[in-house]
Amino acid sequence: TSAEVPATAQGVTHALEGTQ
């Protein structure tokens, strides 16, 4: 769904931030 796309993108961004 449309709501699933932004949710996944936010999750990836948060994961990348945690890695850095």
Swiss-Prot record:
Subunit annotation: F-type ATPases have 2 components, CF(1) - the catalytic core - and CF(0) - the membrane proton channel. CF(1) has five subunits: alpha(3), beta(3), gamma(1), delta(1), epsilon(1). CF(0) has three main subunits: a, b and c.
Biological function: Mitochondrial membrane ATP synthase (F(1)F(0) ATP synthase or Complex V) produces ATP from ADP in the presence of a proton gradient across the membrane which is generated by electron transport complexes of the respiratory chain. F-type ATPases consist of two structural domains, F(1) - containing the extramembraneous catalytic core, and F(0) - containing the membrane proton channel, linked together by a central stalk and a peripheral stalk. During catalysis, ATP turnover in the catalytic domain of F(1) is coupled via a rotary mechanism of the central stalk subunits to proton translocation.
Protein name: ATP synthase subunit delta', mitochondrial
Sorted UniProt keywords: ATP synthesis, CF(1), Hydrogen ion transport, Ion transport, Membrane, Mitochondrion, Mitochondrion inner membrane, Transport
Annotated compartments: Mitochondrion; Mitochondrion inner membrane
Main location: mitochondrion
Gene Ontology cellular component annotations, sorted alphabetically: mitochondrial inner membrane; proton-transporting ATP synthase complex
Regions crossing the membrane: none
Disordered: region residues: 1-20
Similarity comment text for this entry: Belongs to the ATPase epsilon chain family.
Coiled-coil regions, chain positions: none
One of the protein's GO biological processes: proton transmembrane transport
